[in-house]
Amino acid sequence: MRKILINHFNKAIYLYVLIGFGMSHAGSYDDFFKAIQIDDVRTIQQLLARGFDANTLNPQGQHGLLIAIKEPSLKVAQLLVSAPKVDLNILSASGESPLMLAALKGELDLAEKMVKKGADINKTGWTPLHYADSNGHVGIIKLLLENHAYIDAESPNGTTPLMMASLYGSPQAVKLLIDEGADPSLKNQQGLTALEFARRGSRPDAIELLSKTTRIKQADGKW
């Protein structure tokens, strides 16, 4: 009888510990994603110090670092990038990496940290350089090129960073790419060059830069 009681007692203790752990984990999970939304660095620091996984996904399958950059919750994003085992090459459902989002938003400090930690600069398809050029973030464009970003990287439909800069970016971004050797003669799957992108976007500065480059190359016999 005594042995039976001891067994029941041990099972009860085990269930109590198991339930307590589950409740604690659920609380930590909720706290983690709430802290990301409000840029609460202190809570994130405490959770990571207790062993919470920085790569935990929310119910929609979104990685905490991607959420932090999108919010933006930049203090939390900086902290998560510094976490020892964080996955810097995690992709969103639409194929965007943390570095791509930082490039799109012009977050140079964050991008520098990720590049130093080995974030993928030349991922297949759309790249961080495409994203930086689409908003004309010259500082990030320079950072990526200095770290061997492929200047004529092609998206799934053949669009290059120069095409994105010509349509959406700044004249400074277009000039930088041309000066660094981007090829204005390339065409995407629709047969459009960077110059035609600029014309479609009614971008007079980009049109002038690209037209001048085209004339020079044709005169030199390079095309």
Language-model regions, residue ranges each:
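Ankyrin repeat structural motif
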Residues: 40-48, 73-82, 107-115, 137-146, ...
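Bacterial N-terminal signal peptides
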Residues: 11-21
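Ankyrin repeat boundary/linker residues
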Residues: 58, 92, 122-125, 155, ...
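N-terminal segments that cap or nucleate solenoid repeat domains
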Residues: 27-63, 67
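Ankyrin repeat A-helix N-terminal signature
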Residues: 34-39, 67-73, 101-107, 131-137, ...
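Ankyrin-repeat-protein effector appendages
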Residues: 2, 24-31, 147, 180, ...
